[in-house]
Amino acid sequence: IVVALLALNSACSSTNATIRTPAFSGPEQAHTSGAVSRLAVPDNYGGQTTQVYLTGYSYWDNTPPGSAQIARPVIHNRAGGTGTYDDPVTLAVGHVKNGGRSTMDFQAGTRFYIERLRKYAIVEDLCGDGNNPQDGPCHSGYNGRPWIDIYVGGRHSDKTFTTNCMYRITGLQNVIINPNPGLPVSAGELAASGCQVF
């Protein structure tokens, strides 16, 4: 179990660092079975409802490790956020590298609402490494679903606790892309709540 938990670490990066790829990509290591409970969301909250494969990255496994650097700041200068509409949590997404330029799978600034976390999130970081990140799971997705990586924090928690926290949220999750404000929120750092799911 410890090996499986450690394999769940995913990492994202700043523009000055090498971007690392989540350590797993096969269904045999997925945390959830695909059965995802659904929060009742009124139709008037805008956006597109879809399902994504969600992983987490932390202060401890970011690139560089022990930092909150991000590659595409929009609201935050460093990874963070409490999950409210006005202070969404930093998200990392896959990207394609071509001629030294990265094209993100979702544009920087795209907001998501992650139903089981009751958090708004915003794309501000890259997920995937090397010269061909498009060949990795962050870009190619999981079982036909987009892959997003949410920052859980963890600077004030130990590494093992934070890893277990990330494991708890890893799996298929219902999201709303470009949601309106006003959805239920559980504000605060994910790691501080033990990555509580609803």
Q: For each of these PLM feature ranges, what is it?
A:
Residues 1-2:
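N-terminal export and membrane-targeting signals
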Residues 9-11:
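C-terminal motif of bacterial Sec signal peptides marking the signal peptidase cleavage site
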Residues 16-198:
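Solvent-exposed, well-ordered loop and adjacent helix/strand elements within mature globular domains
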